[in-house]
A protein has these predicted regions:
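A short beta-strand micro-motif
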Residues: 2-9
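A short, exposed loop/beta-hairpin motif centered on an aromatic-Gly-Thr core
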Residues: 11-23, 46
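Short, mixed-charge low-complexity intrinsically disordered segments
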Residues: 14, 31-50
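Short, surface-exposed linear segments at secondary-structure transitions and domain or protein termini
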Residues: 22-33
């Protein structure tokens, strides 16, 4: 499972979502309009940060 952690604005609490594919996760992270988004792989390493 791929994890997406998003922040709506600088002082908001992070929201965590899980995805089956990196492509779906990347699409939401890149186009979701978030203040910050991190894509975390299965071993807990941040692969992408927007």
């Amino acid at each position: 499972m791929i994890t997406l952690i998003t922040w709506e604005h600088e002082s908001s609490k992070p929201e965590v979502r899980e995805f089956e594919t990196v492509a779906a996760c990347y699409n939401l992270a890149a186009n979701g309009g978030f203040y910050k988004a991190q894509i975390v792989n299965e071993v807990g390493v941040v692969d992408y940060e927007f």
